[in-house]
Amino acid sequence: MIPLVLEESGGSERVFDIYSRLLRERIIFLGEQVTSETANRIVAQLLFLEAEDPDKDIYMYINSPGGSVYDGLGIFDTMQHVKPDIHTVCVGLAASMGAFLLAAGTKGKRSSLRHSRIMIHQPLGGARGQASDIRIQADEILFLKERLNTELSERTGKDYETIKEDTDRDFYMSPSEAVEYGLIDLVLDKKPVKV
């Protein structure tokens, strides 16, 4: 069930689902597995927020176990395409494609809450069919692995061979370890108080 928020304005009341209300504050929430439906929604939100104000930052909160590489790359490419800076924040878990999208935020604006976990690994896939079909699928997975590792290398400052070795198996990090690794820039302990 999606929570609803009641907002009073000018003597009238409006009801929003919580995600629509957050979007009005330029906040996108990825709180599920990355699928085509998730990707379409997030891409649309990014494009909408850019059209609304191309000079105002966007905030993306991520609590995701990962998901489809193709759909995640669609989100990633859109994040790089839109003009606004994108703050990414891990809340809970950013694993696999979730971690990749966390690292895709604007450098200097990638963060995590302190008890979150972050995990990178190589793409997963299965193959069936005739030997030639299995070979085609294996080549595609190797291509995707190379693309993801190249992007992670560029975003973290780690050399490609280190990324390749670290993503060979599940590689878990605490937020402070993710800062050291270059996946994020900051561990958020407390929300700053505005005076």
UniProtKB/Swiss-Prot annotation:
Keyword Transmembrane helix: no
Protein EC: 3.4.21.92
InterPro entries per UniProt: ClpP, ClpP/crotonase-like_dom_sf, ClpP/TepA, ClpP_Ser_AS
Hydrolase among keywords: yes
Localization, UniProt: Cytoplasm
Gene Ontology molecular function: ATP-dependent peptidase activity; ATPase binding; serine-type endopeptidase activity
Top-rank EC class of the record's enzyme: hydrolase
Active site: 96, 121
Entry keywords, A to Z: Cytoplasm, Hydrolase, Protease, Serine protease
Source organism superkingdom: Bacteria
Assembly information from the UniProt record: Fourteen ClpP subunits assemble into 2 heptameric rings which stack back to back to give a disk-like structure with a central cavity, resembling the structure of eukaryotic proteasomes.
HAMAP family, A to Z: ClpP
Function: Cleaves peptides in various proteins in a process that requires ATP hydrolysis. Has a chymotrypsin-like activity. Plays a major role in the degradation of misfolded proteins.
UniProt record similarity statement: Belongs to the peptidase S14 family.
Name the UniProt record assigns to this protein: ATP-dependent Clp protease proteolytic subunit 1
UniProt source species: Prochlorococcus marinus (strain MIT 9312)
Taxonomic path: Bacteria, Bacillati, Cyanobacteriota, Cyanophyceae, Synechococcales
